[in-house]
Amino acid sequence: MAHYHDNYGKNDEVEFVRTGYGKDMVKVLHIQRDGKYHSIKEVATSVQLTLRSKKDYLHGDNSDIIPTDTIKNTVHVLAKLRGIRNIETFAMNICEHFLSSFNHVTRAHVYVEEVPWKRFEKNGIKHVHAFIHTPTGTHFCEVEQMRNGPPVIHSGIKDLKVLKTTQSGFEGFLKDQFTTLPEVKDRCFATQVYCKWRYQRRDVDFEAIWGAVRDIVLQKFAGPYDKGEYSPSVQKTLYDIQVLSLSQLPEIEDMEISLPNIHYFNIDMSKMGLINKEEVLLPLDNPYGKITGTVKRKLPSRL
């Protein structure tokens, strides 16, 4: 028999802002076999639930708690029963399950990220069941759904590391008594892209949109293959990515981007009698600059 502890009970001087619990990093490899042709999705899923009652917090009454081990098992079973066509749909399936199965669940939040496996391919021929890990950007999504509400769907790219050796500069910035940074017309530009966007609706080709955003990120960072494109600041490149994404992809409502400025500094070799003309550089992990920005579509004018 459960014993509830009422030593504290409800405190009139504090109130709950938000509560939640769940299971993080539930890993699954789903294999779809169509004869000898196999397709895979490997994902890590994190689930957070909010319950109507707060009696578990107030009194130690666990009677409404769905064990986190059950949450883990549910993720496994839904992968078996529903498959993983794409991670956004899988996340919506998980939200739908908990909200429809348990009346006392008021909110479900699901985060899923996909391991970047790519099918072996040579001379245009794709292997039927072999894959290679290609860390050229991780596909992730977040879906949050309130009871009696629609799912709010975000997708994103993270861990997309890019570098260009020219066509970047930083000039005309504010200077005060603490400024030692020199202006530069030509420098290396390296960053690790974090990009997250919200969809206006759910009847979209999520994987096609993700691929299109990734292509836009690479296009605006690098520019034309034969000559590149000049970047006067990380901020300008970030904004250009957002504007092109929202102009070309009407399914996207808003977009958040974070671009750390990963530094590569010229190594002074003058004491060794050598002139190093930006040929040998020192990568510095930290400290680093960090540039962020979020844009959304403007509401149409009522005039």
Swiss-Prot record:
Urate binds at T68, D69, F170, R187, V234, Q235, N261. The active site is at K23 (charge relay system), T68 (charge relay system), H263 (charge relay system). Acetylation of Lys-118, Lys-164 and Lys-290 is observed in liver mitochondria from fasted mice but not from fed mice. May be deacetylated by Sirt5; however it is unclear whether Sirt5 mediates deacetylation or desuccinylation of Uox; additional evidence is required to validate these results. The modification N6-acetyllysine is found at K10, K23, K27, K36, K118, K122, K164, K175, K185, K220, K227, K277. The modification Phosphotyrosine is found at Y288. It is an enzyme of class 1 (oxidoreductase). Pfam families: Uricase. It comes from the Eukaryota. Keywords: Acetylation, Mitochondrion, Oxidoreductase, Peroxisome, Phosphoprotein, Purine metabolism. Its EC number is 1.7.3.3. The modification N6-succinyllysine is found at K10, K23, K220, K227. SUPFAM superfamilies: Tetrahydrobiopterin biosynthesis enzymes-like. It catalyses: urate + O2 + H2O = 5-hydroxyisourate + H2O2. Signal peptide: none annotated. One of its GO terms (cellular component) is cytosol. GO terms for biological process: adenosine catabolic process; allantoin metabolic process; amide catabolic process; AMP catabolic process; dAMP catabolic process; deoxyadenosine catabolic process; deoxyguanosine catabolic process; deoxyinosine catabolic process. Belongs to the uricase family. PANTHER family: URICASE (PTHR42874:SF1). This is Uricase. It comes from Mus musculus (Mouse). The gene is Uox.
